[in-house]
């Protein structure tokens, strides 16, 4: 996916989250060599660390969520929590963007 397509998907995801009563805390948090968290949001005192995936079809987008990617996200989340000295409840989520369809998958696991 091109950077431009990725940026468009992230903007759609942010709009979706805001309409769903999420507060956007941070975008594109880079955790040194660990990786990037696309969106950090909060709703009902729970932090949501969100990976945005976009593709021409749903199956391709879902298949791009690998155990390696989830492991990097988890390490990035741990780094963010430690760096900011937070004691929080959180969820690792994915937003799938295919054209104008957006789906939030909450609390994904490996």
From Swiss-Prot:
<dbReference type="GO" id="GO:0003676">
    <property type="term" value="F:nucleic acid binding"/>
</dbReference>
<dbReference type="InterPro" id="IPR011335">
    <property type="entry name" value="Restrct_endonuc-II-like"/>
</dbReference>
<dbReference type="InterPro" id="IPR011856">
    <property type="entry name" value="tRNA_endonuc-like_dom_sf"/>
</dbReference>
<comment type="similarity">
    <text>Belongs to the UPF0102 family.</text>
</comment>
<dbReference type="Pfam" id="PF02021">
    <property type="entry name" value="UPF0102"/>
</dbReference>
<dbReference type="InterPro" id="IPR003509">
    <property type="entry name" value="UPF0102_YraN-like"/>
</dbReference>
<protein>
    <recommendedName>
        <fullName>UPF0102 protein Abu_0255</fullName>
    </recommendedName>
</protein>
